[in-house]
């Protein structure tokens, strides 16, 4: 049976919550949303997901503008070209490179 992204997300959250109880640690899930439609991000945010990762700057900027939600924490994932540093720093809270 093929799980849709909502069911898959809920399964992952259940596993994370079990590990949090056992290990008494804070675990933060970053959902990589590159190439995905912005409506999926909105749906996951409604379920409590706050951290989303992108590595295509132009695509990410479009999503950030379309969604316009201050509760979402945007993560830039991947290599950085020097000519894009300013735009990345203006749009993302975290950089993972």
Annotate each language-model stretch with its function:
Residues 1-97:
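Conserved alpha/beta-domain cores
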């Amino acid at each position: 049976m093929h799980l849709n992204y909502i069911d898959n997300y809920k399964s992952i959250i259940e596993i994370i919550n079990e590990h949090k109880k056992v290990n008494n640690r804070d675990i933060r899930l970053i959902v990589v949303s590159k190439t995905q439609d912005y409506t999926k991000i909105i749906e996951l945010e409604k379920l409590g997901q706050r951290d989303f990762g992108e590595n295509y700057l132009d695509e990410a900027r479009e999503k950030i503008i379309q969604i316009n939600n201050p509760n979402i924490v945007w993560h830039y994932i991947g290599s950085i070209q020097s000519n894009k540093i300013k735009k990345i720093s203006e749009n993302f809270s975290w950089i993972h490179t």
